[in-house]
Curated annotation (Swiss-Prot):
GO cellular component: extracellular region
Organism: Ixodes scapularis (Black-legged tick)
GO molecular function: serine-type endopeptidase inhibitor activity
Residues bearing carbohydrate: 119, 147, 286
Protein known as: Penthalaris
Tissue expression remark: Saliva (at protein level). Salivary gland.
Keyword check for Signal: yes
Disulfide bonds: 40-92, 65-88, 100-150, 125-146, 158-202, 166-189, 181-198, 210-259, 220-242, 236-255, 267-320, 292-316
Signal peptide start and end residues: 1-22
A Pfam family it matches: Kunitz_BPTI
Keywords: Disulfide bond, Glycoprotein, Protease inhibitor, Repeat, Secreted, Serine protease inhibitor, Signal
Length: 330
């Protein structure tokens, strides 16, 4: 894997580093009235050095504070370079209360009272149980209050309130109920000029990422293999992407199991293995390891066209492990 990559121009590689995630991740939101707008513009601040200093930067296209490793430890208050996610949120995402990222204490449902809290990892207000009389950050008695305080401000342009009446049909918008981006209907104006802009901003709120165009984050901290579901070919394709991408899947298994089925793809069927250990060499797809492995078959006359059993390795690879044309080896 590689780190600190600009997708437009690959300029450096700094090794590998894995890090833990917050309980409630930063799912992103619009902040048009930012207190330090210039600091939040553009790419993560590029500087010289050989260090790997963890920090954060604000990604305007995703409207999200993202992890990044910088080559030096100088944090300039005027640059898109932050020591903590809280500092980034205060500077670039000030329209969303910081309480919306707090995880409140919970108790057993049978002993507590149901309240609503905003889960920024899921991008929605969920019901939890708290002790009777419990108050504090990110605890709301009603879901509508949670939506108004946290969800809608964080969704920003993806929120329903950004679709307004107008004289003609203009722009595109995010349909919260359908969880997809679409062209705005007649006499309504959407906040996005293109569907791609909408998906870039709102894809993090889509739970089933099976109809999202091929998108990649412009700036990468860690470059890794990712898996994108091609809704036309109905296959999970291997691509190069960021480890924290919100447009695709981290594993082929998750991609196949989310977007396809045993009836639709033989790649999801249990492997058709030979039982005698003799016969002609055949191939099957192991979805867990994402590999095409060998087996043997005596009953070569059987029709295996719809089974997880392939005559040639290339047939297995092309069917279950297709690579998008831009994929390069790490």
């Amino acid at each position: 894997m590689q780190r600190n990559i600009l997708w437009i121009s690959v300029v450096a590689a700094f090794g590998v580093f894995h890090f833990g995630e917050c309980t409630y991740q930063d799912s992103g939101e619009d902040s048009s009235s930012m207190t330090e707008e210039s600091r939040c513009d553009g790419p993560p601040h590029a500087s010289r050095g050989l260090m790997n200093i963890p920090g954060w930067f604000y990604d305007g296209s995703r409207d999200q504070c993202r992890r990044y490793h910088f080559p030096d430890q100088q944090f300039d208050m005027a640059k898109n370079k932050f020591k903590t996610v809280t500092e980034c949120r205060k500077s670039c995402r000030s329209t969303v209360p910081l309480q919306c990222f707090k995880k409140p204490p919970q108790t057993i449902r049978t002993m507590g009272l149901p309240v609503s809290t905003y889960n920024s990892t899921q991008g929605e207000c969920v019901t939890i149980a708290v002790r009777p009389g419990q108050t504090g950050p990110n605890i709301f008695r009603r879901e509508v209050e949670c939506n108004e305080t946290c969800r809608d401000p964080e969704y920003g342009k993806c929120a329903p309130l950004h679709i307004v009446d107008c004289g003609g049909s203009t722009g595109n918008h995010y349909n919260l109920d359908k969880q997809t981006c679409e062209k705005t209907t007649k006499n309504k104006c959407g906040p996005f000029a293109t569907l791609e802009d909408c998906f870039k901003r709102c894809a993090r709120y889509i739970q089933r990422k099976c109809n999202i165009p091929l998108l990649k984050s412009e700036y990468c901290d860690i470059v890794d293999l990712r898996y994108w579901y091609n809704s036309e070919s109905k296959q999970c394709e291997e691509i190069m992407g960021c480890a924290d991408d919100v447009y695709n899947f981290p594993t082929a298994k998750e991609c196949w199991e989310t977007c396809s089925s045993k009836e639709e793809s033989r790649c999801l069927q249990p492997p058709d293995l030979g039982k005698l250990g003799i016969g002609r060499t055949r191939y099957y797809y192991n979805i867990t390891s994402n590999r095409c492995l060998t087996t043997t078959h005596v009953a070569f006359w059987q029709n295996t066209e719809k089974k997880n059993n392939f005559k040639r390795r290339s047939d297995c690879e092309n069917t279950c492990r297709p690579k998008h044309k831009d994929v390069k080896k790490l």
